[in-house]
From Swiss-Prot:
Protein name: Adenylosuccinate synthetase
GO biological process entries: 'de novo' AMP biosynthetic process; IMP metabolic process
Gene: purA
Source organism per UniProt: Ehrlichia canis (strain Jake)
Gene Ontology terms: cellular component: cytoplasm
Keyword Zinc-finger: no
Domain of life: Bacteria
Pathway connected to this protein: Purine metabolism; AMP biosynthesis via de novo pathway; AMP from IMP: step 1/2
Cofactor(s) it depends on: Mg(2+)
Length: 431
């Protein structure tokens, strides 16, 4: 039995989908444990490109159980659309290979409308995807969310729960001169989608526990990245859930006593979608080259990702926060063109040096990166599958990051295809 939690150590888009797809070849189940359809995974298999938002990456492989845990906020329409899209490509999702937690809060039309309204009212936008994720999590915390299990209720009970939800939302809408939403409209939405969702619903905490008891291998697939975490990220430019490894235990109901490997993903450089601090950002030809070579467009938003040098301060802090035991580096090939490559090793502000990210947004806005410069390799690493065949300067770059982060790199991704992977150490898959 092996349990592996996969988390991003930057601002998301580290390539978790491809890596989980690769790992799931040796797994029995893959579990999503937080976020919603505001996160996107792009997976390339035999030149076919699949873009997933809610479904775990394992759905592309036969014989794997894919699970959505209770920590996910579930947009039922987005899920059904994703399932139908895969079906049109010959991939069938059934109750035998897919399960949804009965405790998932549902993202409804009222949440998406609230997301757009709140973003318009903010003085400084945070760059929300307008998918309704934040308002849904807010309703969950305030104990008024409609959950998947509520779809089993008699209609009159469901009506009462929706009425309670809308008593809050309609009050807000009234204050900004927006028309109220009728309870019956939301109830009808739910009744129409219920038959398509309920066949997949089960107590997934129990399902996962049974898999662990049977010594099965489970991958826990994180969404977004460490510095989008609601508690540990660059607040307020963050998502609405916890994105670090510990959320896996809460977001699907497993206990921390189970032996778990925690795999942290980093790009060989840094990217960010949307607003917020970005200490190594390159608004120049360097950033443009990274953007073009890395094809840096958001899977969900289709927005251009901002690009910059590798930030080892952030990555080291992320390693500590999640207790990372091994690293995966992705998109090494994007750096092939540079004659020299920089790594941010410290921040400075007013003659003070920081080896961590201060929580204060004000101080964050003043931080300047302190770089260490390494020679580039200017030789193609694209599609490489052998570590010893990498250019020596590429190996030196990898070793420098291992040295700073104090964690070994197990895998290196050198292209979008499933098998474009350098395996340095895969012992974690078997013990």
């Amino acid at each position: 039995m092996v349990n592996i939690i996969v988390v991003g150590l930057q601002w998301g888009d580290e390539g978790k989908g491809k890596v989980v797809d690769w790992l799931s070849t040796n797994a029995d189940a893959v579990v999503r444990f937080q976020g919603g359809n505001n996160a996107g995974h792009t997976i390339v298999v035999n030149d076919n490109v699949y873009k997933l938002n809610l479904l775990p990456s394992s759905v592309l492989q036969n014989g794997k159980l894919s699970i959505i845990g209770n920590g996910v906020v579930l947009d039922p329409y987005a899920l059904i659309s994703e399932i139908e899209n895969l079906k049109s490509n010959g991939i069938n999702i059934t109750s035998q290979n897919f399960a949804i937690s009965e405790s998932c809060p549902l993202v409804l039309s009222v949440h998406k409308q609230a997301d757009m309204l709140f973003e318009q009212l903010r003085q400084d936008t945070i760059g929300t995807t307008n998918k309704g994720i934040g308002p849904c999590y807010a309703d969950k915390i305030s104990r008024r969310a409609i959950r998947v299990c509520d779809l089993f209720d008699p209609k009159d009970l469901l009506h009462n729960k929706v009425n309670h939800l809308l008593s809050y939302h309609n009050l807000l809408r009234k204050n900004i001169n927006n028309p109220s939403i009728e309870t019956e409209n939301i109830v009808n939405e739910l009744l129409s989608i219920a038959p398509k969702i309920l066949p997949f619903v089960q107590p997934v905490w129990k399902t996962i526990h049974n898999l662990i008891e049977q010594n099965k291998t489970i991958i826990f697939e994180g969404a977004q990245g460490t510095f989008l975490d609601i508690d540990h990220g660059t607040y307020p430019f963050v998502t609405s859930s916890n994105t670090i490894a510990q959320q896996a235990f809460i977001g699907c109901g497993i206990n921390p006593s189970n032996k778990t490997h925690i795999l942290g993903l980093v790009k060989a450089y840094t990217t960010r979608v949307g607003n917020g601090p970005f200490f190594t950002e390159q608004n120049n030809n360097i950033g443009k080259t990274m953007f073009e070579s890395g094809k840096e467009l958001g899977t969900v938003s289709n927005r251009q990702r901002r690009c910059g040098w590798f930030d080892a301060v952030l990555a080291r802090q992320a390693v500590i926060l999640s207790g990372v035991s091994g690293l995966v580096m992705t998109k090494l090939d994007v750096l092939d063109q540079f004659s020299e490559i920089k790594i941010c090793v410290k921040y400075k502000y007013e003659n003070k040096i920081y080896d961590y990210l201060p929580a204060s947004p004000y101080i964050q806005s003043k931080l300047e990166p302190v770089y260490e410069t390494l020679p580039g390799w200017q030789t193609s690493t694209f599609g490489s599958v052998s570590y010893k065949d990498l250019p020596q300067n590429a190996i030196s770059y990898i070793k420098k990051i291992e040295e700073i982060l104090k964690v070994p790199i197990y895998l290196i991704s050198t292209g979008p295809e499933r098998n474009s992977m350098i395996i340095i150490n895969n012992d974690f898959l078997y013990k």
